[in-house]
Structure formats: structure tokens, C-alpha cells
Amino acid sequence: MKAILINPEKEEVTEVEYSGDYQDIYKLIDCKTFDVVRTSVSNDGIYIDDEGLFAKEQAYWKFDYCDDQPHIKLVNKGLVLGCNDEGDSIAPESTVDYIKSRIIWRW
């Protein structure tokens, strides 16, 4: 299934293939533990490195959740996936262009 990879080091947002196996999230975002930040689109979320602030190399970025809320400050790679009613990961409803439009690199 498709997913959206956010790479703040390269300042890139790209579509990638995700197998559906949660262990691949670790590989795609280069982390040992992850957490999820909600987006304003449907049930989409951004998987992030839960220990990003402790990483030796850090690349900062902000996600503009919605116009009337402060930006969410994040560190290192993120992976956008959707979620169905059963809690399973699915392709996100967000588009690459939408995600790009909501990111501010560095903070």
C-alpha cells in the first residue's frame, strides 16, 4: 500500500510503498520506537521516532495541523498512514502535495 515518507534531512516528501507490517515502520523512519501524531485529514496519522530528541543526528520540522492551532514540532523522519475502523493501517487519504503544504522545515 502507499504511504507518505517525510524526510526532513533532505527536505523531501515522497510516496513510498508500505507492506502493512508494523515492523517496516521502524525501517522506513529509522527508529527503535515510534508514536503517532494525528493529522487533520480523516484518520491519517504521522508515525514519528518516539526517541527523536535523543538521537545523535536530528532534523527538525513543524507540521501545521490546522490554521487555528500551533504547529506541531517534530524531529527526524515521519511516515503518513491512514487507519480503518478496526485500527489497521491503510493508505492515507492525505496527498503528497497536501503534506508538503503543511510542513515548515527546521524550527
Identify the meaning behind each predicted range:
Residues 1-107:
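Short beta-rich binding modules
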